[in-house]
Amino acid sequence: MKQYIYADNAATTQLDPQAFEAMIPWLRDEYGNASQPYSFSRKPKKAIAEARAVIAECINADPEEIYFTSGGTESDNWAIKGSAFSDSGHHATITSQIEHHAVLHSCEATERIGYPVAYLPADEEGRILPETLDRYISDRTRLVSVITANNEIGTIQDIAGLADISHAHGAM
């Protein structure tokens, strides 16, 4: 058998055997649409509600605050477009020039319809420095989106430092 190394785990990764086993009943037998009112949907709806409650408890949130998406791209779209279209009076978004394409494309889409976006430059090591963010941010900034660990070059950002500056200006 040929041996190989799969090096694109940032995009998709092998499913954990325990997760696979846990999903078999839902994929094979209990696949009703949890959003529908018919009887075949009761078990999936209950399982999703229970999963939402477990996750909420783990992160000290309310279950109503937990949303499941199909993956990172959909989540990025929700966060960026939802923030831009919110009625808060704060509509500017800040991201970096080295973000994942899902973030960059969502930011570009909001720019095309008039929402301001600023793109932070990275230093020679791929870092987004807090002092750089401090120069770009304003009280109109609603969202700052910086990838924690860059999917191409691996740089790990100072998220705590960036978050402190963002929160000081009322941004997420």
Could you say what each language-model-derived stretch is?
Residues 1-172:
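Pyridoxal 5′-phosphate
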